[in-house]
Design a protein with these regions (language model features):
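Short beta-strand-to-loop acidic/aromatic patch adjacent to the donor-nucleotide binding site
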Residues: 229-243
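Catalytic beta-strand/loop signature of glycosyltransferases that borders the donor
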Residues: 271-273, 356-363
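Long helical/loop segments within the catalytic core of UDP-sugar-dependent glycosyltransferases
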Residues: 199-227, 249-337, 375, 379-390
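Active-site donor/metal-binding and catalytic loop motifs
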Residues: 359-373
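Cell-envelope/extracellular polymer assembly enzymes that use nucleotide-activated donors
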Residues: 143-148, 179, 344
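Acidic donor-binding loop at a coil-to-helix junction in glycosyltransferase catalytic cores
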Residues: 337-345
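Juxtamembrane C-terminal module of membrane proteins
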Residues: 27-68, 79-87, 106-144, 168, ...
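Short, acidic, metal-binding catalytic loop of nucleotide-sugar glycosyltransferases
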Residues: 162-177
């Protein structure tokens, strides 16, 4: 069999058949996914906040449901079978290489297999069982949580939206005392309030290890913050939007970790799912491209954090950590760690023996607004993670595993180039590489679609696309996968050719059309640190933290 397209390229009926069968297949996949998102009308509620919370609970049940696991597994197998059928029907067996460079090109097909380890780890999430829910979910706990937002201070609109989203959600899901810390490089015009502290990093501030960028700001915050050592810190970016399910997930995680701490264990560091649909209407293409990140959260990263072992890095946003654990490892990571300070810090925490965990709920953020920022964002990640692998004070095995993932990231990008080139050469492909590549591709199709499903299903009903528009998004999600893969590869190749030398900050708008991901609440309120809910209880709202199937 052959993965090239020389036969179809010379016979237009083959191309038409390929496109037609592909579209029918994609529509079928979209309908299957849409079927899982339909909610019974009898569960509809009248109050916006309760309706949003119940919708969250149903999504949680869907993701945890055994049938949904089988649906995703079926999508992987079904997609692979369809690929094999299309190859057998539309393509010839390919030709053998005649020149040395053709033999070299043929061997490049094995690069398809480079993504197999990451795909396998992601697939492990299908067999992991979610932890049991605590019996006292919803009970108010007297543990202060500080939402720490780090920004350059240039986008006041985004900061204002983030602060408002925290207050809106905490006014409804009042599960713990809270405060907000905004860490900026310049003065910002945020209205003073009892629940808000603005920390301005002095322009002449220098850390002992010469850390830069966000690492410098975080180190300053840990030095001057007045948080109690047993308080908790939730890290988010300037455009982050907190949701109801996330507040519940934070509450559950803090309660569980405080129980472990009382038994003599070190509280673990938590992370969860991030959605990127805030600008779906304004920037649908790049939002679809970031469906992979959400799908990766609920698969590969879920496997990592549920196992408690750090092996593929950590996001810089959605980090939940107790203050004394956070300050035990300095964010003064030096120039080498300043590009991806989050992962550098996390690997040093792992070296100290600190464990990791999954946190229910999701944080809403936005995708890059243009192709240049998209590629440069990926370049920063790739360059920074290599510095982590080379310089982080972590165990050798942990650094080697990270190097393996980073090498596979590059090689899989090369495999994408091979696919394009072989469209014109028509070389035969070794069947093991073909089978492995087909399975990897099928897994990524499922990951993209699952990420999109979760993102759309978590949007409030009034902002969610119509059934027809959603169907179009699912079809576009798969049809544009070669484009998305090229964008991801461009970031990696850019990192190899011109490694990140600074800290590229992508442009983010202020107010977004996406609004709150899981509610339509308009009321704004705040809870001052140390205040207590009546009778020690949260408001009587039937909610549940949003989870993935493995969290």
């Amino acid at each position: 069999m052959n993965t090239g397209l020389p036969l179809a390229a010379h016979h237009w009926h083959g191309i038409i058949a390929l496109v037609g069968v592909g579209l029918l297949t994609l529509i079928g996949l979209a309908c299957a996914v849409l079927a899982t998102r339909t909610l019974p009308d009898r569960d509809a509620l009248t109050q916006d906040d309760i309706d949003a919370a119940r919708a969250n609970r149903r999504v949680t049940r869907r993701l945890d449901d055994e049938r949904f696991r089988w649906v995703r597994l079926g999508m992987v197998v079904g997609c692979w079978i369809i690929l094999e059928v299309l190859r057998a029907v539309l393509f010839d067996d390919g030709r053998q290489p005649s020149w040395w460079w053709e033999r070299l090109l043929q061997n490049a097909s094995w690069f398809w297999c480079a993504a197999a380890p990451a795909s396998f780890i992601g697939a492990m999430s299908l067999v992991l069982r979610r932890r049991a829910r605590p019996d006292d979910t919803g009970t108010w706990i007297n543990h202060l949580v500080c939402f720490r937002v780090v920004s350059r201070g240039l986008n006041v609109d985004a900061l204002t939206d983030t602060v408002a989203s925290i207050r809106e959600v905490m006014a409804v899901r009042d599960l713990f005392p809270y405060r907000i810390e905004v860490v900026v490089d310049t003065e910002v015009a945020l209205s003073p309030a009892d629940d808000l502290t603005v920390l301005v990093v002095p322009s002449d501030y220098v850390t002992p290890n010469q850390s830069k960028y966000k690492a410098r700001a975080l180190h300053y915050a840990t030095e001057v913050s007045t948080l109690d050592p047993t308080s908790w810190v939730f890290h988010c970016d300037e455009e982050s939007q907190v949701t109801h399910g996330l507040v519940g997930g934070i509450r559950d995680a803090v309660a569980e970790e405080e129980t472990r701490a009382s038994q003599g264990f070190t509280p673990r560091i938590g992370q969860g799912t991030i959605l990127y649909t805030r600008h779906l209407k304004e920037s649908p293409i790049l939002t679809l491209a970031d469906s992979l990140r959400t799908g990766d959260d609920i698969t590969r990263f879920a496997t990592q954090f549920r196992s408690g072992v750090m092996f593929c890095g950590m996001h810089g946003s959605f980090i939940l950590c107790r203050s004394d654990v956070e300050t035990a490892v300095s964010f003064d990571v030096g120039p080498e760690g300043s590009i991806t300070e989050d992962a550098f810090w996390a690997y040093e925490q792992a070296q100290r023996g600190v464990g990791f965990r999954w946190v229910d709920g999701y944080l809403l953020e936005q995708s890059p607004e243009n192709l240049k920022d998209f590629a440069k964002q990926r370049r920063r990640w790739y360059s920074g993670l290599w510095k982590v692998a080379l310089y982080a004070p972590a165990a050798l095995w942990a650094r080697l595993v990270l190097m393996l993932f980073l090498s596979a990231w590059l090689l899989s990008a090369v495999g994408g180039v091979y696919t394009f080139v072989n469209l014109f050469t028509g070389l035969s492909t070794p069947w093991p590489a073909e089978v492995c590549g087909g399975l990897v591709f099928s897994w990524y199709v499922t990951t993209y679609l699952t990420g999109l499903w979760l993102s759309l299903r978590s949007m409030p009903p009034e902002l969610r696309p119509s059934r027809l528009a959603s169907c179009g998004l699912y079809v576009a999600q798969v049809l544009l996968m070669p484009v998305f893969g090229s964008l991801e590869a461009a970031g990696v190749f850019l990192a190899v050719i011109a490694p990140e030398q600074g800290f590229h900050v992508i442009k983010k708008a202020g107010s977004a059309g996406g609004g709150q991901a899981d509610d339509g609440i308009a009321a704004v309120g705040r809870r001052c640190p140390g205040a207590r809910a009546p009778d020690g209880q949260a408001p009587d709202i039937d909610t549940s933290p949003m989870t993935s199937d493995a969290r």
